[in-house]
Amino acid sequence: MEKVKIFISYHDEHYRIKSNILTPIQTGCANAPRLFKGMQHDNEGENISDRNDKYCELSAQYWVWKNYNKVGNPEYVGFMHYRRHFMFDGWQGNPDWCWLPKGNVYFVTNITSGYLSHISDEHIKQQLENCDCIVLKPYNVRHLHSKNIRMQYSKLPEQDVHIFDVFIKTAKSLYPEYRDDITKIEKGSVQYLSLIHI
């Protein structure tokens, strides 16, 4: 059994990162004009690939969940994105590449062998020896001049705040025992971005 598998979601042809641990997976294959060679496809086995336009890289996460036995039943499962990677050796990136103010999230325009050394299998294994879970540092939306998560969501041109409100109302209705926690998140200013985690 592999100790860890980290799936990297792709929906376009980009530099493919692949190792014993890092596994590329194409998302939205059910509606894609073509399948990329040399990677897992999210339309095999039980899947929601045909709904990728609504769920984005969650179609990869669903695929891994429902097809866990096909990926070797690893102790740890993780997810990254072709444009969003953890740096497993503590590298902080170039401040000129900063994507979010005070967020420690950077744009990298060119993936080189030097860059890849930060996400090597050895660094991944070492990092996981010391923790049970890895997520991005929480990001405070006040750095983007928003009072809370709902306000930040309402500022995004591709989003509809009505959907956010329906989600909150539905979650509180279905899970009343979490009502206070849901309200705290909704009215709070801290969020975890990018759908990357292990």
Where are these predicted regions, by residue range?
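ER/Golgi luminal nucleotide-sugar-dependent glycosyltransferases, focusing on the catalytic module
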Residues: 1-196
